[in-house]
A protein has these predicted regions:
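Flexible, acidic/Gly-rich N-terminal and inter-domain linker regions that tether
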Residues: 2-96, 475, 483-484, 491-521, ...
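A glycine-rich phosphate-binding loop feature that marks nucleotide/adenosyl-phosphate handling sites
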Residues: 60-61, 241-248, 362-367, 402-418
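Short, charged beta->alpha transition segments
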Residues: 89-91, 120-131, 312-313
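Conserved AdoMet/S-adenosylmethionine-binding subsite of the radical SAM
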Residues: 123, 146-398
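Short Fe-S-cluster ligation motifs
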Residues: 127-141
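Long, highly charged, low-complexity intrinsically disordered interaction regions
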Residues: 372-440, 481-503, 507-508
Length: 533
């Protein structure tokens, strides 16, 4: 038997001796009631509501004698009609669950088909699908089987087998279970490329109402430990403690990843050391306080964690969780505003250095008086606007407090968030494109990072005109209201919020604005749709 597997077995047995799980929950992980194909159909379908999976962010190439690679450009994705990613083998290890979260289809009280994969079955499926070029990697999540520690043991055993016995060198994203031990969290970080812990809801009140078995502290605690461990491992191999961001961020002094913003965030955090009250005015302050109260500024300290890492991973040739960590929030299950969601998002990026925050429009599945009624259309357009706002935070130098406020807590869904912001700050427009700096250009609707870079480069060598701006990628149907080129507007239009709003809505008006959600269903394409199963 492989030395790593022997080590894992010893650790697992030691942890099981400490494990206090509900012995009345008699669930056999081998579950002989279903074939592997039937389990795949059940558990792939059960995983479709988890959207927190994208490309790897890793640069690990293929190796002789090993299977797969995690090169960033090699993780290619197909998307279903509703935007769900289907290129990873996205499955649950089990949909048995000891928790009774009201929003979840797999909640304990639901009468649904239950199945559980063994680690070997998951490995076989991953390798066989990869060899057939159906998938590019594995996204593994799970319900709570017996208890968090037992569940994480089985998930880590699966990853260990993939990395050692099957020599799988491809991309792996694991959804960790809050409440599992630090030992298992450490081993998951060495074995997977990306780790995520779902925040689920942006407030403690929302969690208490819909997920009584979960607390914000138990979710943020592993998130903070993973962040600290990633930072220490990055520094150990000569990199910055912070995750790599878009190169354009170095020109955005007001962005959430700028040195000034990081110092301000640290200053706010330190200012709370003598203040035991959690501010109710800002979700960012709430997350800062949780980070301090739960002692999150410490790396995972299990000295034997490297023993679970396959070969070269244990010698710091590869960062701990090289693709970083992510999380997911449900949109529309509770009454939080866009402002609360965006403030929470910014706090997660700054306080926990998350690589991505994902949003999932809630699809009513369960009958409960605190949830939207079954048949209520999911807020897909709101989800889309939040993703656009998320990009403004990560790539355009905006802060959450600029985009929304307590006085205006929600986006105008009829126009994109950047236009919404510009219309509330018309005193800053029009912008002269031949003189404005990169950061100012990025705040103009219709101008993105690439076109802003092209503008700043091209104007060194000559004058610009609207034809050249169009060739550079500027979306003039939105931008022309907010810019001048050579002191002239493209059309003579009044700089008035009501007029521009009407024009933008008419320009961008498509069928989605008049969608009538009648007899519609929202489903994710599965592997069976492609004739895989």
């Amino acid at each position: 038997m492989n030395d790593h597997i022997q080590t894992f077995v010893r650790k697992t047995l030691a942890l099981q001796n400490k494990c206090l799980y509900n012995k009345n929950m008699n669930t056999d992980i081998r579950n002989s009631n279903y074939t592997t194909q039937e389990k795949l159909q059940i558990l792939a379908d059960a995983a479709k509501y988890d959207v927190a999976c994208t490309s790897s962010g890793s640069s690990r190439r293929e190796k002789k004698g090993e299977l797969g690679n995690a090169e960033a450009c090699g993780i290619c994705h197909s998307f279903a009609a509703d935007g769900r990613c289907i290129s990873l083998l996205k499955i649950l290890m089990t949909n048995h669950c000891a928790y009774d979260c009201k929003y979840c289809i797999n909640r304990k009280s639901n009468d649904v088909k239950r199945a559980t994969f063994t680690p070997e079955e998951i490995c076989d499926l991953t390798v066989e699908f990869y060899k057939r070029n159906y998938i590019e990697g594995l996204f593994l999540s799970s319900g709570i089987l017996k208890n968090p520690t037992y569940t994480m043991e089985k998930m880590c055993e699966t990853l260990l087998l993939l990395r050692t016995k099957y020599h799988f060198n491809g991309y792996i994203h694991i959804k960790t279970i809050p409440g599992a031990s630090d030992e298992l969290l450490a081993s998951a970080g060495y074995l997977a490329d990306r780790i995520s812990v779902n925040l689920e809801l942006p407030t403690e009140e929302g969690l208490h109402m819909l997920a009584p078995n979960k607390t914000m502290k138990n979710i943020l605690n592993p998130m903070g430990k993973v962040q600290s461990t990633i930072a220490s491992h990055r520094m150990a191999i000569g990199k910055s403690a912070y995750m790599d961001r878009s190169g354009g961020n170095k020109f955005l002094n007001a962005g959430i990843f700028s040195d000034a913003s990081k110092k301000h965030f640290s200053k706010c955090l330190n200012a709370q050391k003598n203040d035991t009250a959690v501010s109710q005015d800002s979700q960012m302050n709430q997350l800062e306080s949780y980070k301090r109260y739960t002692s999150l500024d410490h790396a995972l300290t299990w000295e034997n964690a490297n023993q679970l890492a396959p070969r070269d991973m244990s010698q710091l040739k590869r960062s701990f969780a090289p693709a970083g960590q992510s999380t997911q929030m449900i949109i529309g299950a509770t009454g939080e505003s866009d402002y609360t969601l965006l403030q929470t998002t910014q706090a997660l990026y700054q306080g926990f250095d998350l690589k991505r925050v994902f949003y999932s429009a809630y699809i009513p599945l369960n009958e409960d008086n605190v949830l939207p009624e079954i048949g209520t259309p999911p807020p897909l357009l709101r989800e889309h606007r939040l993703y656009q706002a998320d990009w403004l935070l990560r790539f355009y130098g905006f802060q959450a407090g600029e985009l929304l406020s307590l006085e205006q807590p929600n986006f105008n869904e009829m126009i994109d968030p950047k236009c919404d912001w510009a219309l509330r700050h018309l005193e800053q427009f029009p912008v002269e494109v031949e003189k404005a700096n990169y950061a100012t250009l990025l705040r103009v609707p219709g101008i993105g990072p690439k076109s802003a870079s092209r503008i700043t480069y091209a104007r060194r060598y000559g004058r610009l005109d609207y034809d050249s701006l169009k060739k550079m990628g500027v979306v003039l149907k939105r931008a022309h209201y907010f810019i001048t080129c050579g002191g002239k507007q493209l059309y003579h239009t009044p700089i008035e919020a009501s007029y521009i709003t009407r024009q933008l809505i008419n320009v961008d008006k498509k069928d989605i604005w008049n969608t009538q959600h009648v007899n519609e269903s929202f489903t994710q394409m599965t592997l069976t749709d492609f004739g895989v199963c």
